[in-house]
Design a protein with these regions (language model features):
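Donor nucleotide-sugar binding/catalytic pocket of nucleotide-sugar-dependent glycosyltransferases
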Residues: 52-55, 130-186, 197
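Short hydrophobic beta-strand element within catalytic cores of glycosyltransferases
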Residues: 299-302, 312
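Acidic donor-binding loop of glycosyltransferase active sites
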Residues: 271-285, 298
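Nucleotide-activated donor-binding/catalytic signature segment of Leloir-type glycosyltransferases, i.e.
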Residues: 233, 242-263
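Glycosyltransferase donor-sugar binding loop
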Residues: 35-39, 201, 228-243
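Short beta-strand->alpha-helix junction loop in the catalytic core
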Residues: 116, 154-155, 172-184, 203-206, ...
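Conserved acidic donor-binding segment of nucleotide-sugar-dependent glycosyltransferases
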Residues: 313-315, 319-326, 335-341
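A conserved mid-protein helix/loop that constitutes part of the nucleotide-sugar donor-binding site
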Residues: 14-19, 196, 200, 205-219, ...
Length: 378
């Protein structure tokens, strides 16, 4: 039984869905991974997975280019003849599902991690695109043999309000999960007089709260606190809310933050951190950086926003602050800096929660259950 996993980058497939692909393969499925080419396709192939390149521009709205993409998908699905296509992100859900319906693929699963720029932004381009994307999503997500996987209850309500979710066809599954054997608490070598370290790991978008993070760092430094503020991630020039690289380098030049760029081994990086923050005011699905940090037993600070509040319960396994409030963020960081007991308690609780809810084995099992609902085993 052949299934296709379709995503907009090979980076996504490798970092978030390789465990699912390997588990499906071990369970007897024939798995084909589909994405544009990138730096991670060789890694997928080295794992013994089958991967195929598909040329697509995840930011394009050119009608001719998009029609070519749709036709490529239809031809590929007709040639490969999968019984199920599993699409990730909004654009892949739209084109993958429409192509699958044309190619008469019997089952379609669309995993959408938040509503994305078109629905969350209020700029002119987003407002113009919204009716078209909504109409395309209605076509893509409808029909027999379709399931929608969402990551949090807020998104479910939003999809229902937009008329995009039908009762009985939505599954709530918490993201891709995390490998809790790899992301786990590690012993740290004691370093005399080493300043505590705070980390923000995210795509470098304004919506992720970068400006608030930098301002919180300024506030705490003005109080005479010796703290290292680290930023991990690369700029995303194609995104309308991307922070310019020149701005990031200016923050570094001012001595406010240290910019690490892309970090491949996040588990090792977390092992040297004291606090992890994500001051996002973006509608997250479920923030992977928070789940990974929680699995490592680190105390978390994030905002009271959809997706974020599913990972952190205030005072129980982390701290929540209002979005776009740099002073509240600074106060929460200061509170954790001043109490090793609180950091330890919240970190331990965060790890316990991840083991119970976000372990990738739980997520993979639930995903396979959705597969079996659509395509019962012979």
């Amino acid at each position: 039984m052949k299934v296709i996993l379709f995503a907009n980058t090979d980076w996504y497939l490798y970092n978030f869905r390789r465990s699912l692909a390997l588990a499906l393969q071990a369970a007897g499925y024939e798995v084909l991974l589909l994405s544009p080419p990138g730096d991670y396709s060789a890694r997928l192939l080295a794992l013994g997975l089958r991967w195929q390149a598909l040329q697509m521009d995840r930011r394009s709205v050119n009608p001719l280019r998009e029609m070519v993409l749709l036709l490529r998908l239809v031809r590929l699905f007709r040639r490969e003849r999968p019984v199920l296509v599993h699409n990730f992100t909004v654009k892949c859900a739209v084109y993958g599902s429409i192509a699958a319906r044309i190619a008469r693929v019997s089952a379609r699963i669309n995993a959408v991690d938040g509503l994305g720029y078109v629905f969350s932004s209020d700029d002119r381009k987003a407002r113009l695109l919204r009716p078209l994307v909504r109409a395309m999503l209605r076509v893509a997500l409808g029909g027999r043999g379709a399931r929608l996987i969402l990551q949090n209850p807020d998104d479910r309500i939003s999809f229902e309000n937009f008329g995009l979710a039908t009762a009985g066809r939505v599954a709530l599954i918490p993201g891709a999960g995390v490998d809790c054997s790899r992301f786990c608490p590690r012993e740290r070598a004691a370093t005399v007089d080493a300043p505590p370290t705070v980390l923000l790991a995210a795509r470098l978008l304004w919506e992720k709260g970068l400006a608030e993070y930098v301002e919180a760092a300024r506030i705490l430094r003005s109080q005479g606190r010796k703290v290292r503020f680290l930023l991990a991630g690369n700029p995303d020039p194609g995104n309308p809310t991307a922070v310019p690289e020149a701005t990031i380098r200016d923050w570094v030049a001012q001595g406010i933050i240290e910019w690490l760029g892309h970090v491949d081994d996040m588990a090792t990086l977390y092992a040297s951190m004291d606090i992890v923050v994500l001051p996002s005011f973006y509608r997250e699905g479920l923030p992977t950086s928070l789940i990974e940090a929680a699995a490592c037993g680190l105390p978390l600070i994030t905002t009271d926003m959809p997706g974020c509040r599913e990972v952190v319960r205030h005072e129980a396994d982390g701290l929540l602050v209002p979005p776009r409030d740099s002073r509240a963020l600074a106060e929460a960081i200061a509170r954790l800096l001043d109490s090793t007991i609180l950091r330890s308690r919240l970190g331990e609780a965060a790890r316990t929660k991840v083991l119970a809810m976000f372990d990738e084995r739980i997520v993979i099992k639930r995903t396979q259950e959705v597969y079996r609902e659509l395509v019962p085993a012979d």
